[in-house]
Amino acid sequence: MFTEAQNFSIVQTELDKVFFQRFDYDDTFPGVAHATTAEIFKPVETTHAAWIQSINKGSGLFPAVGETATVPLSTPKVTNKQTTLVNTYAQGIDISKQLFDDNMHGVWENDVRDFADQAKNTQDFTAFGLFRLGFTTALTADGQAIFSTHTLIGGGTQSNAGTVALTPTSLNTGIVNLMEQKNQAGVISGATAKVLLVAPANWKHAREITDSALIADSGNNNVNVYRSALGLTVWTSHWLGAAAGGSDTAWFLLAANHGFTRLIRQGLETALTDWRYSNNLTYRYQANYRENYFCADYAGSYGSTGTA
């Protein structure tokens, strides 16, 4: 016997089918990054409402010692604590019972697809805010902008920021900066650039620089080392450009040891309230997830405003 409870389950199943097909489907061209792109935002799961991270200064290089000499002691240090609170993101839409019952899929399915799009857009907008605001108000644990000059725990400073527009020469400057970056103990890390992240307006130029067989923007026939040796992956997002409050000229390099993190407390979940509990014969379909994003340390990252 077909029951009302079964009917309710069918309604939620139909809504979830449309929602998650849209939310999980990536119909963009290759190279478009999202909050779920692990090369850019390292996923970390938590069971708490907040995440506390701190920056560590290691021991530094080993000194040479004599045969029976006392082994020198180096004391690691932890400081610059930063707390990231998990945010809850939620939204709901009303769907008329009659609209659903009459099987007017062209209407309610479009509403649910848009609902899924906005869930993904919210994730991406929030995540790439670390880069949009990386020269100003998005801070590392030391209280400085992500892309700026940082005071090292062991003394001295390290800059991971530039101002020059993206060219083969400036890209090399960024690559060298990553390779020669000093860690908190003042030791050169030797990080290798893996990701080049740009706004859509700079995507074509970035691909020409990194993918051309010969050096881009040049009349000579030298081999393009960015393609033949380095293997940079170029990523873009429409949440980086001026249209989204960012910059069309800014560009970023990331190494494997970068600190951009996606903190996940709860993945996307949906819920449906039956029309019987409304006063206007409507279903209420809701979705929510809990997460946040942070970058605690400058290491493994380089950014240029591209304004010079």
Label for each model-derived stretch:
Residues 24-89:
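Assembly/oligomerization interface modules of large self-assembling protein complexes
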Residues 47, 79, 83, 98-112, ...:
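Short, charged/polar micro-motifs that form catalytic or ligand-binding hotspots
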Residues 136, 184-189:
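Surface-exposed acidic, glycine-flexible loop patches that form ligand/cofactor-binding
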